[in-house]
Design a protein with these regions (language model features):
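General small-molecule cofactor/ligand-binding pocket signal
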Residues: 24, 101-103, 194-197
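Short glycine/threonine-rich catalytic loop with a Thr-x-Gly-x-Asp
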Residues: 30-32, 58, 204
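Conserved SAM/SAH cofactor-binding pocket of Class I
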Residues: 42-135, 158
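Mobile active-site "lid"/loop adjacent to the S-adenosyl-L-methionine
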Residues: 126-155
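Conserved Class I SAM-dependent methyltransferase catalytic core
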Residues: 150-201, 205-207
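SAM/dcSAM-binding transferase cores
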Residues: 206-246
Length: 246
């Protein structure tokens, strides 16, 4: 299909620098960030796994994972109709229809949509902000992506636990200041935090992201991995980040 038929007015086609894959995005709506890239590389996806991406946005995580993992199939769940449409067109553009299936729906309904204990891995880059005060328009795409408007942290963790097979992993990126709540909620829903990695914008700055792996019905033992530093200086990525694009 010609590019003009896939990419619409106001949209752009971005090179993911992996296996020739591209993604369709609309800068006025919402574009993926570094958190999605880091989460894709943090997730340890085993060969022939069935994977669910909860809150896929425009589908960047399953597309990246098609390039860097041997998973057999990805289901991707997204509530926003426009994002579902863009994600579906990106999947088609990359010829990945046999590996990625996009479904419109709410994260809090994931187990009703897909069934219980059916996935080998769940990956999620959920809304980070639980304070809805000051939102001028809670229906704006960027607000929905960033704020817990249609699902809460507990919804995300509960549904991940419900759809995961025993001893299988949830991979999540979130904000460090919510770690106590994240860990407590995970353990309430039979998810044991097993691996954690903090992400710092600069070596002298506090972390602004945290990558977490939790295992359903896992044994208590948390491994804290070396931190990721994103920038050496303003506008210059560290070698850690540059290596992700090799």
């Amino acid at each position: 299909m010609y590019i003009k038929q896939q990419v619409r007015a106001g949209e752009r086609l971005d090179d993911l620098q992996r296996s020739g894959y591209h993604i369709i995005q609309n800068p006025e709506k919402f574009c993926f960030g570094m958190d999605a890239v880091l989460l894709s590389h943090f997730a340890e996806i085993k060969r022939d796994s069935r994977v669910l991406d909860m809150g896929t946005g425009t589908g960047v995580i399953p597309i990246l994972l098609c390039a860097i993992s041997d998973a057999s199939h990805f289901d991707a769940l997204e509530i926003q109709e426009e994002s579902v449409d863009m994600a579906s067109r990106s999947v088609a553009w990359n010829g990945l229809e046999k590996r990625i299936h996009i479904t419109q729906g709410n994260i809090r309904d994931a187990s009703s949509i897909f069934g219980r204990h059916v996935f080998d891995a769940v990956i999620t880059n959920p809304p980070y902000v639980n304070d809805k005060h000051g939102l001028k328009n809670p229906k704006l795409p960027k607000a929905i992506a960033r704020h817990e408007i249609y699902c809460t942290l507990e919804d995300v963790i509960r549904e991940a636990s419900e759809v995961l097979k025993p001893k299988k992993s949830l991979f999540m990126v979130h904000r460090p200041h919510r770690l106590p709540e994240i860990f407590e909620t995970m353990q309430q829903h039979r998810l044991e935090p097993k691996r954690m990695r903090l992400v710092h914008p600069y070596i002298h700055k506090e972390p602004n992201m945290v990558l977490i792996e939790a295992v359903r019905d896992g044994n208590p033992m948390l491994k804290v991995e070396p931190p990721i530093i994103v920038y050496e200086k303003e506008g210059k990525y560290t070698q850690q980040i540059l290596d992700l694009y090799k």
